[in-house]
Amino acid sequence: HDEDILAILDKHDMKVTEVEYIVQWCEEHRSYEQKYKEQMCFHMCELFGVGHINCGLMENYSVEYTAQKLKELCQRAGKYIIGVEPMPYSGIPDLKKGWEVVKASGCDNAMLILDTWHWVRADQPYDILTPEIAKKVISIQINDAYERPYAASILRDESMHDRLAPGTGAKDTAGFVKMIKDAGVDPKVVGVEVISDAILGKGLKEAAAYTYENTEKVLKEV
C-alpha cells in the first residue's frame, strides 16, 4: 500500500527523487503490462512528488518514428517530464540519436538523462555536450568503468552487474561531471548508479559508505 511505502521512507529519513522505468513505448500495440507499468510510474510520481520519469528503449527504430512515439508518450505523461536515457546497447545508443529524437518530438516535457557509464561505453568524448543540448538534460547518473569493456554481445551484463564507484575506474568521472557543469546543465537529480555485484556483496552498509565516500571525492574535484 502507498502509506506503507511512505512510512518506510519516513522511518529511514529517505526521499524518492526519480521514478523509472518505462520501456517498449515505441510499439504500435503496447501490452497490457506496459500500459499498467506506465500508469504505475505516473502514480509513483504523484505519490513521491517527483517530476520526471526515466525511460529506456531497447528496440531500434528511425529517429522520425521514435520521435513520434516519444511525443505520444509525453502527451500521456502530461505534467511529468519524460527523461530518455541513451544506452549503447539500446535503440537510442548515444547522445546524437537521443538529442535528435528529443528535438524532433517537439515536446517541452521530452528531455535526456545522461549516465557516465553509458556515455563512456558509447565511446563519446567529454566535449560534445553543447549548451543547447544541456538545457534538455533533466538529470545525470554518475559511476565509473573499467578501461576495457565487456564484449559487445554481453555489454549489458557489465551494465547490470559490474559498474564501478565514481572515481575508482579508468574513465574520469570528474571529467564527465565537469563537462556537465561547463555545458550549463542544471540537473534535478544527481544519481549515483553503481550497479555492482561485487560492491553490493560487501553488505548494504559498506556498499553505501564506499559509494558515498568516492562520490564525494569526485564532486570535490570539480
Residues covered by each model-derived region:
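Alpha-helical scaffolding within the catalytic cores
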Residues: 1-5, 37, 173-176
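Active-site acidic/histidine proton-transfer and metal-coordination neighborhood
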Residues: 8-18, 24-112, 203-207, 214
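Conserved, mostly hydrophobic/aromatic
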Residues: 9, 45, 82, 115, ...
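A structural motif
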Residues: 49-50, 79, 137, 185-187
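Conserved residues at the C-terminal ends of beta-strands
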Residues: 56, 143, 193
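Acidic/histidine-rich catalytic cores of soluble enzymes
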Residues: 72-170
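A short, acidic, amphipathic alpha-helical segment used as a generic capping/interface helix at domain edges
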Residues: 168-183
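A short, acidic, flexible beta-alpha connecting loop/helix-capping segment that sits on the rim
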Residues: 189-206
